[in-house]
Swiss-Prot record:
Catalytic activity from the UniProt record: N-acetyl-L-glutamate + ATP = N-acetyl-L-glutamyl 5-phosphate + ADP
Listed name of the protein: Acetylglutamate kinase
Organism of provenance: Streptococcus gordonii (strain Challis / ATCC 35105 / BCRC 15272 / CH1 / DL1 / V288)
GO molecular function: acetylglutamate kinase activity; ATP binding
Site (Transition state stabilizer): 8, 215
Subcellular localization: Cytoplasm
Gene: argB
GO-annotated biological processes: arginine biosynthetic process via ornithine; L-arginine biosynthetic process
Length: 245
């Protein structure tokens, strides 16, 4: 959809939106842009897990999720992060709606590898009808990084991968993957642009590592699907642009 911007909010931004972030969203909406927000909540999940003396383990940047962890993740994403983000946006006169009952119907997922990751999903399909209905009414949908499989089981999904799938399904003009760092760093400097053909080598050489791997992989997938721009950074305007080439 023309004029659609998908914003993935993660890290510190997922706990508290800055005034600059709110102002930029307001400007885009005033200019006729339609916005979808996808969020993670790793910091809150880590805190809740720590309070319960439960271990946190990641493989290739993805959180290993036991079935018993899911209520905690739901509490963090739906009960805390998503609710707070939606309240902040609405308080700033940005009409928003947190997807709760519609989330599983919108995000269809399946296990990535249950033996390795547990209840971690990969997106199989995004049912866009409800999202399009909200966007047509000038409402910002707010999606937590969760989905359901065919058996109705809840799966934890990496928020970068989910945002990429949403952007691709809506054929958005831009995807922004917000994080706590300014962009992809090489020799302590932000790379202004990375071409899709350079990604494999930068992963092999360790320039792209840890939690940045799923961000870059989702960015590449999104660019190749026809989405105009993918930006990785700590704000809505600057960072590392992922481009086809």
């Amino acid at each position: 959809m023309k004029d659609v911007i998908v914003i993935k909010i993660g890290g510190v931004a997922a706990k508290k939106l800055s005034d600059k972030f709110i102002k930029q969203m307001q400007e885009w909406i005033a200019a006729g842009k339609k916005i979808v927000v996808v969020h993670g909540g790793g910091l809150v999940i880590n805190q809740l897990m720590k309070e319960r003396q439960l271990p946190t383990r990641k493989v290739k940047g993805l959180r290993v999720t036991a079935k018993s962890d899911l209520p905690i993740i739901q509490q963090a994403l739906l009960g805390q992060v998503g609710r707070t983000l939606t309240q902040e946006l609405n308080y700033s006169d940005i009409e928003s709606l947190q997807l709760v009952s519609h989330l599983g119907k919108t995000v269809s997922a399946d296990f990535i590898d249950k033996d390795v990751y547990g209840y971690v999903g990969q997106v199989k399909a995004i049912q866009t009808a409800y999202l399009e209905q909200l966007l047509a009414a000038d409402i910002v949908p707010v999606l937590a990084s969760l989905g359901e499989n065919a058996a109705g089981e809840l799966l934890n999904i990496n928020a970068d991968y989910l945002a990429a799938a949403v952007a691709s399904s809506l054929q958005a003009e831009k995807l922004i993957l917000m994080t706590d760092i300014e962009g992809v760093l090489e020799d302590k400097k932000v790379l202004p642009q990375i071409l899709t053909s350079q990604v494999s080598k930068k992963i092999q050489t360790g320039v792209i590592k840890g939690g940045m791997i799923p961000k870059i992989e989702s960015a590449v997938q999104t660019v190749l699907s026809g989405v105009g721009q993918v930006l990785i950074g700590d704000n809505l305007l600057t960072g590392t642009l992922i481009a086809e080439g």
